[in-house]
Protein backbone atom coordinates (compact mmCIF):
# COMPACT_ATOMS: atom_id res chain seq x y z
CA UNK A 1 0.00 0.00 0.00
CA UNK A 2 1.27 3.46 -0.87
CA UNK A 3 -0.09 6.96 -0.34
CA UNK A 4 -1.54 8.91 -3.29
CA UNK A 5 -2.52 12.56 -3.65
CA UNK A 6 -6.14 13.68 -3.30
CA UNK A 7 -6.48 14.82 -6.96
CA UNK A 8 -5.64 11.29 -8.08
CA UNK A 9 -8.11 9.71 -5.66
CA UNK A 10 -10.76 12.21 -6.79
CA UNK A 11 -10.15 11.33 -10.44
CA UNK A 12 -10.35 7.60 -9.78
CA UNK A 13 -13.17 7.46 -7.24
CA UNK A 14 -14.40 10.94 -6.30
CA UNK A 15 -17.62 10.50 -8.26
CA UNK A 16 -18.83 7.82 -5.83
CA UNK A 17 -18.67 10.12 -2.78
CA UNK A 18 -21.93 10.77 -0.96
CA UNK A 19 -21.77 14.54 -0.30
CA UNK A 20 -23.65 14.28 3.00
CA UNK A 21 -21.00 12.01 4.52
CA UNK A 22 -18.50 14.89 4.48
CA UNK A 23 -20.54 16.64 7.17
CA UNK A 24 -19.77 13.67 9.44
CA UNK A 25 -16.20 12.80 8.51
CA UNK A 26 -13.11 14.52 7.12
CA UNK A 27 -10.88 12.69 4.67
CA UNK A 28 -7.37 12.46 6.12
CA UNK A 29 -5.30 10.44 3.61
CA UNK A 30 -5.63 8.43 0.41
CA UNK A 31 -3.91 5.19 -0.58
CA UNK A 32 -3.68 2.59 -3.35
CA UNK A 33 -2.47 -0.97 -3.74
CA UNK A 34 0.08 -1.96 -6.35
CA UNK A 35 -1.34 -1.20 -9.79
CA UNK A 36 -4.22 0.71 -8.16
CA UNK A 37 -6.36 -2.41 -8.13
CA UNK A 38 -7.66 -1.23 -4.75
CA UNK A 39 -7.94 2.21 -3.19
CA UNK A 40 -7.94 3.11 0.48
CA UNK A 41 -9.17 6.06 2.49
CA UNK A 42 -8.63 7.15 6.09
CA UNK A 43 -11.26 9.42 7.62
CA UNK A 44 -11.52 11.42 10.83
CA UNK A 45 -14.91 11.43 12.59
CA UNK A 46 -15.99 15.03 13.21
CA UNK A 47 -18.30 13.99 16.07
CA UNK A 48 -16.41 11.25 17.93
CA UNK A 49 -12.93 12.52 17.03
CA UNK A 50 -11.65 9.06 16.16
CA UNK A 51 -10.55 7.47 12.88
CA UNK A 52 -11.86 4.99 10.34
CA UNK A 53 -10.88 3.46 7.02
CA UNK A 54 -12.52 2.38 3.76
CA UNK A 55 -11.31 -0.02 1.05
CA UNK A 56 -12.62 0.49 -2.50
CA UNK A 57 -12.56 -2.03 -5.34
CA UNK A 58 -13.96 -1.99 -8.86
CA UNK A 59 -17.49 -3.29 -9.36
CA UNK A 60 -18.74 -5.10 -12.46
CA UNK A 61 -18.83 -1.76 -14.35
CA UNK A 62 -15.23 -0.96 -13.29
CA UNK A 63 -16.32 1.77 -10.86
CA UNK A 64 -14.48 2.06 -7.56
CA UNK A 65 -16.91 1.45 -4.69
CA UNK A 66 -16.56 0.62 -1.01
CA UNK A 67 -16.04 -3.09 -0.27
CA UNK A 68 -14.90 -2.92 3.38
CA UNK A 69 -14.71 -0.39 6.19
CA UNK A 70 -14.13 0.05 9.91
CA UNK A 71 -14.44 2.89 12.42
CA UNK A 72 -13.74 3.95 16.02
CA UNK A 73 -9.96 3.56 15.80
CA UNK A 74 -8.03 5.67 18.34
CA UNK A 75 -5.39 7.21 16.07
CA UNK A 76 -4.35 7.87 12.49
CA UNK A 77 -1.52 5.36 12.87
CA UNK A 78 -3.91 2.66 14.06
CA UNK A 79 -6.24 3.34 11.13
CA UNK A 80 -3.35 3.23 8.68
CA UNK A 81 -2.10 -0.11 10.03
CA UNK A 82 -5.60 -1.59 9.88
CA UNK A 83 -6.11 -0.28 6.34
CA UNK A 84 -2.79 -1.76 5.24
CA UNK A 85 -3.84 -5.15 6.59
CA UNK A 86 -7.26 -4.93 4.92
CA UNK A 87 -5.84 -3.93 1.54
CA UNK A 88 -3.37 -6.82 1.70
CA UNK A 89 -6.24 -9.20 2.50
CA UNK A 90 -8.58 -7.97 -0.25
CA UNK A 91 -5.78 -7.72 -2.80
CA UNK A 92 -5.54 -11.54 -2.69
CA UNK A 93 -9.19 -11.94 -3.67
CA UNK A 94 -10.44 -12.20 -7.27
CA UNK A 95 -12.03 -9.20 -8.99
CA UNK A 96 -15.44 -10.85 -8.82
CA UNK A 97 -15.42 -10.54 -5.03
CA UNK A 98 -15.50 -6.75 -5.41
CA UNK A 99 -18.73 -6.77 -7.44
CA UNK A 100 -21.80 -5.38 -5.67
CA UNK A 101 -24.63 -7.29 -7.32
CA UNK A 102 -26.62 -4.20 -8.32
CA UNK A 103 -24.71 -3.32 -11.50
CA UNK A 104 -26.57 -3.23 -14.81
CA UNK A 105 -24.86 -3.25 -18.18
CA UNK A 106 -21.21 -3.33 -19.13
CA UNK A 107 -18.44 -0.87 -18.26
CA UNK A 108 -18.72 2.41 -20.18
CA UNK A 109 -15.92 2.94 -22.70
CA UNK A 110 -15.79 6.29 -24.49
CA UNK A 111 -12.78 5.28 -26.58
CA UNK A 112 -13.81 1.97 -28.15
CA UNK A 113 -14.87 3.12 -31.66
CA UNK A 114 -18.58 2.81 -32.40
CA UNK A 115 -18.35 4.51 -35.83
CA UNK A 116 -16.03 4.12 -38.84
CA UNK A 117 -12.69 5.92 -38.54
CA UNK A 118 -13.69 8.41 -41.24
CA UNK A 119 -16.47 9.74 -39.01
CA UNK A 120 -14.32 10.33 -35.93
CA UNK A 121 -14.19 13.95 -34.81
CA UNK A 122 -10.70 15.52 -35.12
CA UNK A 123 -10.82 16.67 -31.50
CA UNK A 124 -11.79 13.18 -30.38
CA UNK A 125 -8.85 11.75 -32.33
CA UNK A 126 -6.56 14.28 -30.68
CA UNK A 127 -7.76 13.15 -27.26
CA UNK A 128 -7.69 9.45 -28.11
CA UNK A 129 -4.44 9.24 -30.05
CA UNK A 130 -1.96 12.04 -29.33
CA UNK A 131 0.63 11.30 -26.60
CA UNK A 132 0.74 14.96 -25.54
CA UNK A 133 -2.94 14.66 -24.57
CA UNK A 134 -2.46 11.41 -22.67
CA UNK A 135 -3.10 13.11 -19.27
CA UNK A 136 -6.55 14.17 -20.49
CA UNK A 137 -7.19 10.77 -22.05
CA UNK A 138 -6.35 8.87 -18.88
CA UNK A 139 -8.42 11.29 -16.80
CA UNK A 140 -11.47 10.85 -19.04
CA UNK A 141 -10.93 7.07 -19.01
CA UNK A 142 -11.18 7.13 -15.21
CA UNK A 143 -14.21 9.43 -15.25
CA UNK A 144 -16.15 7.53 -17.91
CA UNK A 145 -16.78 4.53 -15.65
CA UNK A 146 -19.15 6.65 -13.56
CA UNK A 147 -21.04 8.15 -16.48
CA UNK A 148 -24.66 7.13 -17.03
CA UNK A 149 -25.66 7.34 -20.70
CA UNK A 150 -29.31 8.10 -20.05
CA UNK A 151 -30.16 9.04 -23.66
CA UNK A 152 -28.17 6.18 -25.21
CA UNK A 153 -26.17 8.20 -27.75
CA UNK A 154 -23.49 9.92 -25.65
CA UNK A 155 -20.58 7.78 -26.88
CA UNK A 156 -21.46 8.08 -30.58
CA UNK A 157 -21.84 11.86 -30.29
CA UNK A 158 -18.64 12.15 -28.24
CA UNK A 159 -16.74 10.39 -31.03
CA UNK A 160 -18.36 12.33 -33.89
CA UNK A 161 -20.14 15.65 -34.38
CA UNK A 162 -20.96 16.24 -30.71
CA UNK A 163 -17.45 15.85 -29.30
CA UNK A 164 -17.12 19.44 -28.04
CA UNK A 165 -20.63 19.55 -26.58
CA UNK A 166 -20.20 16.23 -24.79
CA UNK A 167 -16.81 17.31 -23.41
CA UNK A 168 -18.57 20.41 -22.06
CA UNK A 169 -21.04 18.12 -20.24
CA UNK A 170 -18.16 16.09 -18.80
CA UNK A 171 -16.54 19.32 -17.63
CA UNK A 172 -19.73 20.30 -15.80
CA UNK A 173 -19.94 16.83 -14.24
CA UNK A 174 -16.36 17.09 -12.97
CA UNK A 175 -16.75 20.68 -11.73
CA UNK A 176 -19.91 20.10 -9.73
CA UNK A 177 -18.62 16.83 -8.31
CA UNK A 178 -15.56 18.73 -7.11
CA UNK A 179 -17.76 21.39 -5.49
CA UNK A 180 -19.53 18.67 -3.53
CA UNK A 181 -22.62 17.67 -5.51
CA UNK A 182 -23.81 14.21 -6.46
CA UNK A 183 -25.70 13.58 -9.67
CA UNK A 184 -29.11 11.93 -9.66
CA UNK A 185 -28.45 9.00 -12.04
CA UNK A 186 -32.08 8.28 -12.96
CA UNK A 187 -32.87 11.83 -14.11
CA UNK A 188 -33.26 11.97 -17.90
CA UNK A 189 -33.83 15.74 -18.13
CA UNK A 190 -32.22 18.14 -17.60
CA UNK A 191 -28.61 17.02 -18.15
CA UNK A 192 -27.49 17.26 -14.52
CA UNK A 193 -29.76 17.11 -11.50
CA UNK A 194 -27.49 17.69 -8.52
CA UNK A 195 -27.80 17.63 -4.74
CA UNK A 196 -25.28 18.17 -1.97
CA UNK A 197 -24.61 19.96 1.29
CA UNK A 198 -24.91 23.30 -0.54
CA UNK A 199 -28.40 22.53 -1.84
CA UNK A 200 -29.85 21.40 -5.15
CA UNK A 201 -29.23 22.61 -8.73
CA UNK A 202 -30.61 21.46 -12.09
CA UNK A 203 -28.43 22.18 -15.13
CA UNK A 204 -29.07 21.90 -18.85
CA UNK A 205 -26.01 22.23 -21.09
CA UNK A 206 -26.17 23.96 -24.46
CA UNK A 207 -23.71 25.06 -27.12
CA UNK A 208 -23.60 27.54 -29.97
CA UNK A 209 -22.59 25.45 -32.97
CA UNK A 210 -21.12 26.16 -36.43
CA UNK A 211 -23.66 27.41 -38.98
CA UNK A 212 -25.09 24.68 -41.20
CA UNK A 213 -24.38 24.95 -44.91
CA UNK A 214 -22.79 28.40 -44.77
CA UNK A 215 -19.52 29.82 -43.55
CA UNK A 216 -19.06 32.02 -40.52
CA UNK A 217 -19.20 35.61 -41.82
CA UNK A 218 -15.80 37.17 -42.56
CA UNK A 219 -14.56 39.54 -39.86
CA UNK A 220 -11.27 41.01 -41.00
CA UNK A 221 -11.88 44.76 -41.15
CA UNK A 222 -12.65 46.83 -38.05
CA UNK A 223 -16.23 47.34 -39.24
CA UNK A 224 -16.71 43.61 -39.83
CA UNK A 225 -15.20 42.73 -36.46
CA UNK A 226 -17.44 45.21 -34.64
CA UNK A 227 -20.59 43.86 -36.32
CA UNK A 228 -19.52 40.26 -35.73
CA UNK A 229 -18.92 40.77 -32.00
CA UNK A 230 -21.82 43.15 -31.33
CA UNK A 231 -24.51 41.25 -33.24
CA UNK A 232 -23.58 37.99 -34.99
CA UNK A 233 -22.10 36.24 -31.95
CA UNK A 234 -24.86 37.42 -29.57
CA UNK A 235 -27.43 36.05 -32.02
CA UNK A 236 -25.65 32.66 -32.02
CA UNK A 237 -25.65 32.64 -28.22
CA UNK A 238 -29.26 33.82 -28.12
CA UNK A 239 -30.43 30.94 -30.27
CA UNK A 240 -28.53 28.40 -28.19
CA UNK A 241 -30.17 29.71 -25.02
CA UNK A 242 -33.69 30.24 -26.39
CA UNK A 243 -33.62 26.71 -27.82
CA UNK A 244 -33.49 25.51 -24.22
CA UNK A 245 -35.86 28.17 -22.89
CA UNK A 246 -38.54 27.19 -25.43
CA UNK A 247 -38.08 23.41 -25.15
CA UNK A 248 -41.42 21.60 -25.72
CA UNK A 249 -41.13 20.09 -22.24
CA UNK A 250 -39.97 22.95 -19.98
CA UNK A 251 -36.96 21.71 -18.06
CA UNK A 252 -37.95 23.50 -14.86
CA UNK A 253 -41.22 21.51 -14.84
CA UNK A 254 -39.47 18.12 -14.88
CA UNK A 255 -40.27 15.99 -11.84
CA UNK A 256 -36.56 15.63 -11.12
CA UNK A 257 -36.11 19.41 -10.80
CA UNK A 258 -38.78 19.75 -8.10
CA UNK A 259 -38.22 23.40 -7.25
CA UNK A 260 -34.43 23.49 -7.54
CA UNK A 261 -32.77 26.48 -9.24
CA UNK A 262 -32.65 25.75 -12.98
CA UNK A 263 -29.47 26.87 -14.73
CA UNK A 264 -28.39 26.80 -18.39
CA UNK A 265 -24.67 26.13 -18.96
CA UNK A 266 -23.57 27.78 -22.23
CA UNK A 267 -20.44 27.21 -24.30
CA UNK A 268 -19.59 28.66 -27.72
CA UNK A 269 -18.25 26.34 -30.42
CA UNK A 270 -19.59 28.19 -33.47
CA UNK A 271 -16.01 28.84 -34.70
CA UNK A 272 -12.50 27.85 -33.58
CA UNK A 273 -11.57 29.80 -30.48
CA UNK A 274 -15.04 31.36 -30.25
CA UNK A 275 -15.29 30.83 -26.51
CA UNK A 276 -12.42 33.29 -26.02
CA UNK A 277 -14.94 36.15 -26.06
CA UNK A 278 -17.98 34.36 -24.62
CA UNK A 279 -17.92 36.05 -21.20
CA UNK A 280 -18.26 39.73 -22.24
CA UNK A 281 -20.58 38.95 -25.16
CA UNK A 282 -22.86 36.62 -23.20
CA UNK A 283 -22.92 39.07 -20.30
CA UNK A 284 -24.11 41.86 -22.60
CA UNK A 285 -26.71 39.62 -24.23
CA UNK A 286 -28.31 38.02 -21.16
CA UNK A 287 -28.47 41.33 -19.24
CA UNK A 288 -29.28 43.43 -22.32
CA UNK A 289 -26.79 46.17 -21.47
CA UNK A 290 -23.48 47.29 -22.93
CA UNK A 291 -20.81 49.15 -20.97
CA UNK A 292 -18.23 51.42 -22.56
CA UNK A 293 -15.81 54.11 -21.40
CA UNK A 294 -16.48 57.60 -22.78
CA UNK A 295 -14.13 60.39 -21.66
CA UNK A 296 -13.10 58.37 -18.62
CA UNK A 297 -16.65 57.61 -17.45
CA UNK A 298 -18.71 54.42 -17.74
CA UNK A 299 -21.52 54.72 -20.27
CA UNK A 300 -24.39 52.22 -20.01
CA UNK A 301 -26.44 51.44 -23.11
CA UNK A 302 -29.64 49.38 -23.22
CA UNK A 303 -29.13 47.26 -26.32
CA UNK A 304 -32.68 46.43 -27.42
CA UNK A 305 -31.98 44.20 -30.44
CA UNK A 306 -29.15 42.38 -32.19
CA UNK A 307 -29.34 42.52 -35.99
CA UNK A 308 -27.01 40.94 -38.53
CA UNK A 309 -28.20 40.68 -42.13
CA UNK A 310 -31.57 38.94 -41.97
CA UNK A 311 -30.88 37.59 -38.48
CA UNK A 312 -32.57 39.35 -35.57
CA UNK A 313 -32.89 38.57 -31.87
CA UNK A 314 -34.02 40.77 -28.99
CA UNK A 315 -31.31 41.47 -26.45
CA UNK A 316 -31.80 40.69 -22.77
CA UNK A 317 -32.32 36.94 -22.42
CA UNK A 318 -33.51 37.32 -18.85
CA UNK A 319 -36.28 39.68 -20.04
CA UNK A 320 -37.82 37.11 -22.41
CA UNK A 321 -41.15 35.41 -21.59
CA UNK A 322 -40.61 32.40 -19.29
CA UNK A 323 -36.98 33.40 -18.62
CA UNK A 324 -37.95 34.03 -15.00
CA UNK A 325 -37.79 30.23 -14.68
CA UNK A 326 -34.05 30.31 -15.45
CA UNK A 327 -32.08 31.10 -12.30
CA UNK A 328 -28.75 31.79 -14.02
CA UNK A 329 -26.55 31.18 -17.05
CA UNK A 330 -23.17 29.52 -16.48
CA UNK A 331 -20.09 30.03 -18.67
CA UNK A 332 -16.50 28.89 -18.59
CA UNK A 333 -14.29 29.71 -21.59
CA UNK A 334 -11.57 27.55 -19.99
CA UNK A 335 -13.75 24.43 -19.70
CA UNK A 336 -12.15 22.72 -22.70
CA UNK A 337 -9.81 19.87 -23.58
CA UNK A 338 -6.78 21.85 -22.41
CA UNK A 339 -8.14 22.03 -18.86
CA UNK A 340 -8.71 18.26 -18.92
CA UNK A 341 -5.07 17.86 -19.92
CA UNK A 342 -3.82 20.02 -17.05
CA UNK A 343 -6.11 18.40 -14.51
CA UNK A 344 -4.95 14.99 -15.73
CA UNK A 345 -1.32 15.91 -15.19
CA UNK A 346 -2.07 17.26 -11.71
CA UNK A 347 -3.57 13.84 -10.89
CA UNK A 348 -0.49 12.05 -12.19
CA UNK A 349 -1.98 10.69 -15.40
CA UNK A 350 -0.47 10.44 -18.85
CA UNK A 351 2.94 10.07 -20.42
CA UNK A 352 5.52 11.17 -17.80
CA UNK A 353 7.54 12.89 -20.53
CA UNK A 354 4.79 15.48 -21.06
CA UNK A 355 5.57 18.90 -19.61
CA UNK A 356 3.12 21.81 -19.45
CA UNK A 357 3.49 25.53 -18.76
CA UNK A 358 0.38 27.70 -18.44
CA UNK A 359 0.30 31.46 -18.86
CA UNK A 360 -2.46 34.00 -19.24
CA UNK A 361 -4.29 37.07 -17.97
CA UNK A 362 -6.36 37.25 -14.77
CA UNK A 363 -8.73 39.76 -13.19
CA UNK A 364 -7.15 42.01 -10.58
CA UNK A 365 -10.08 43.68 -8.82
CA UNK A 366 -9.52 41.59 -5.68
CA UNK A 367 -6.16 43.31 -5.20
CA UNK A 368 -6.75 46.52 -3.23
CA UNK A 369 -3.27 47.84 -4.09
CA UNK A 370 -3.36 47.27 -7.86
CA UNK A 371 -6.76 46.21 -9.29
CA UNK A 372 -5.55 46.04 -12.89
CA UNK A 373 -5.55 42.71 -14.80
CA UNK A 374 -2.28 40.85 -14.34
CA UNK A 375 -0.26 38.28 -16.24
CA UNK A 376 0.50 34.89 -14.72
CA UNK A 377 2.76 31.98 -15.61
CA UNK A 378 2.72 28.57 -13.90
CA UNK A 379 4.62 25.33 -14.44
CA UNK A 380 1.83 22.74 -14.42
CA UNK A 381 4.36 19.91 -14.14
CA UNK A 382 5.57 21.05 -10.71
CA UNK A 383 4.05 19.27 -7.67
CA UNK A 384 3.03 22.57 -6.06
CA UNK A 385 0.83 23.62 -9.02
CA UNK A 386 -2.88 23.59 -8.18
CA UNK A 387 -5.99 24.23 -10.23
CA UNK A 388 -9.65 23.48 -9.68
CA UNK A 389 -12.29 22.42 -12.16
CA UNK A 390 -14.46 25.40 -11.23
CA UNK A 391 -11.65 27.90 -11.91
CA UNK A 392 -12.70 30.24 -14.72
CA UNK A 393 -16.44 29.67 -14.25
CA UNK A 394 -18.72 32.72 -14.56
CA UNK A 395 -22.30 32.71 -13.24
CA UNK A 396 -24.69 35.32 -14.67
CA UNK A 397 -27.57 35.66 -12.19
CA UNK A 398 -31.10 36.37 -13.37
CA UNK A 399 -32.47 39.42 -11.52
CA UNK A 400 -36.03 38.24 -12.34
CA UNK A 401 -35.58 34.62 -11.26
CA UNK A 402 -38.54 33.05 -9.48
CA UNK A 403 -36.08 30.69 -7.78
CA UNK A 404 -32.78 32.56 -7.32
CA UNK A 405 -29.48 30.73 -7.30
CA UNK A 406 -27.49 31.63 -4.20
CA UNK A 407 -23.81 32.44 -4.89
CA UNK A 408 -22.64 30.08 -2.16
CA UNK A 409 -24.19 27.19 -4.09
CA UNK A 410 -21.31 27.52 -6.57
CA UNK A 411 -18.31 28.59 -4.49
CA UNK A 412 -15.03 29.75 -6.07
CA UNK A 413 -16.82 30.91 -9.24
CA UNK A 414 -17.14 34.49 -10.52
CA UNK A 415 -20.73 35.70 -9.93
CA UNK A 416 -22.21 38.64 -11.87
CA UNK A 417 -25.35 40.55 -10.84
CA UNK A 418 -27.23 43.17 -12.88
CA UNK A 419 -28.16 46.24 -10.83
CA UNK A 420 -31.32 48.33 -11.44
CA UNK A 421 -29.26 51.18 -12.94
CA UNK A 422 -27.63 48.85 -15.48
CA UNK A 423 -24.36 48.47 -13.64
CA UNK A 424 -23.01 44.98 -13.00
CA UNK A 425 -21.73 43.91 -9.60
CA UNK A 426 -19.01 41.24 -9.59
CA UNK A 427 -18.37 38.75 -6.80
CA UNK A 428 -14.90 37.39 -7.52
CA UNK A 429 -12.87 34.45 -6.21
CA UNK A 430 -9.26 34.99 -5.21
CA UNK A 431 -8.04 34.01 -8.70
CA UNK A 432 -10.17 34.48 -11.81
CA UNK A 433 -8.41 34.09 -15.19
CA UNK A 434 -9.72 35.90 -18.23
CA UNK A 435 -7.86 33.55 -20.57
CA UNK A 436 -4.80 31.34 -20.73
CA UNK A 437 -2.79 29.09 -23.00
CA UNK A 438 -0.79 25.99 -22.21
CA UNK A 439 2.53 25.05 -23.80
CA UNK A 440 2.78 21.26 -24.00
CA UNK A 441 6.28 19.89 -24.52
CA UNK A 442 7.04 16.31 -25.54
CA UNK A 443 10.34 15.05 -26.94
CA UNK A 444 11.65 18.58 -27.50
CA UNK A 445 8.61 19.79 -29.46
CA UNK A 446 6.35 22.41 -27.91
CA UNK A 447 2.72 22.96 -28.83
CA UNK A 448 1.01 26.06 -27.46
CA UNK A 449 -2.72 25.52 -27.01
CA UNK A 450 -5.12 28.30 -26.03
CA UNK A 451 -7.65 27.07 -23.49
CA UNK A 452 -10.29 28.33 -25.87
CA UNK A 453 -8.91 27.09 -29.19
CA UNK A 454 -6.93 24.57 -31.19
CA UNK A 455 -3.24 23.73 -31.20
CA UNK A 456 -0.51 25.76 -32.81
CA UNK A 457 3.03 24.44 -33.23
CA UNK A 458 5.47 26.72 -31.39
CA UNK A 459 8.89 25.17 -31.78
Protein language model regions, located:
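Internal, well-ordered domain-core segments that constitute the primary functional module
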Residues: 179-181, 191, 200-201, 217, ...
Amino acid sequence: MHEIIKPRFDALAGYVRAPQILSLVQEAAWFASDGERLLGLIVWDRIDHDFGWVVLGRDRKARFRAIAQDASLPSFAAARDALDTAIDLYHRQPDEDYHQGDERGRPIDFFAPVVPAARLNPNFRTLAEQPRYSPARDLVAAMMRFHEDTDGNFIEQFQTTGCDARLWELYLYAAFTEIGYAMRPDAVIPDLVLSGRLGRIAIEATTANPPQGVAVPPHRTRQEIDAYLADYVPIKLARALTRKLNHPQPYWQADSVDGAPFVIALQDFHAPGAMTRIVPIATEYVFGVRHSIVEGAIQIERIGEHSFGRMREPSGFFDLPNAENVSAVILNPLGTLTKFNRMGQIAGFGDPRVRMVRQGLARGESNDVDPRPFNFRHDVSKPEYTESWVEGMVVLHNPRALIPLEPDQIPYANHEFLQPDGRIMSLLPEFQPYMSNTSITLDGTTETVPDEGGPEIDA
